From Swiss-Prot:
This is UPF0297 protein BcerKBAB4_4234. Transmembrane segments: none annotated. InterPro entries: IreB. Belongs to the UPF0297 family. PANTHER family: UPF0297 PROTEIN YRZL.
Length: 88
């Protein structure tokens, strides 16, 4: 019964680490543009609502964007914005 007394760790970090926010956003942006949507409006709609219907299946964009948590995407967007617009 010793094997049942130990807590096992489960990690899915490897998949998440291989997905970069920048790559995801560019793929989603291109897919939306190719389908004739306003990419900014659609991405904002997804980030605010969490509804994947804002992102098309074209280029597998919907499943790619769902590999990241929305807060991870928002965090990276804020970091990037501040990095490029901050007065020093």
């Amino acid at each position: 019964m010793d094997g049942f007394d130990k807590t096992m760790k489960f990690s899915i970090q490897d998949e998440k680490q291989s997905v970069h926010v920048n790559d995801v956003l560019l793929t989603v942006y291109d897919a939306l543009q190719e389908k004739g949507y306003n990419p900014i409006n659609q991405i904002v709609g997804y980030l605010l609502s969490g509804d994947p219907a804002y992102i098309p299946r074209h280029k597998d964009a919907r499943s790619i964007v769902r590999k990241l948590e929305r807060d991870e995407i928002i965090e990276e967007l804020v970091k990037s914005y501040l990095k490029h617009h901050r007065e020093e």
